Amino acid sequence: GSGETASKESRQVVELTEQLLETGFSARAALKLVNTVLLLAGAEQHPATLDVSCIDLHTGVLEVMKLGAVPTFIIDDEGVEILEAGQVPMGIMNGVEPVLMSRKLWDGNRIIMVSDGVLDALPGDDKEQVMKQYLESVDEMGPQELADQILDFAVSFIPAPRDDMTVLTAGLWKRHS
């Protein structure tokens, strides 16, 4: 969503999720509990999506949990992988389970998470493939520059943003001592 109400609701969902994780809930349990809270909030609450990614820096394992969120993209030596979980947003149905995915990351891999506003701005019906093709064409660069270029690419297709457009990127590199 967009606007002050959507911003406030998103902030509340993020803060509740953070509090649950900080108190020791597993990510899966936290997402299920947040979904229940949104259901109980009822009509005054709008649907929300949640997209959580955790990287174990010792093992290089990425854990992605999605509830209604758009795909996450991983750039590696072989190309771009799309991690997607086509589910309804939080707060719509009871019993919705977060989709869990794990991937082993290697030196030089990059992770890209975008809001639905970024994908919605892209042309065509298969927006995930448009993003994948774009990511396959970009040169290697730092996470901030990559995020800026992805946002510029998406914005180039629309006269003005109609929704939140957020890009979050991360890279994984071996520490050389």
Task: Describe each PLM feature range.
Residues 54-56, 104-107:
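Extracellular and analogous surface-interaction loops
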Residues 4-77, 84, 98, 154-163, ...:
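Catalytic core of PPM/PP2C metal-dependent serine/threonine phosphatase domains
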Residues 72, 176-177:
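Short, surface-exposed beta-strand/loop "edge" segments at domain boundaries and coil↔beta transitions
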Residues 1-24, 84-87, 94, 105-161, ...:
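Active-site-proximal, acidic helix/loop segment immediately C-terminal to a metal-coordinating Asp/Glu
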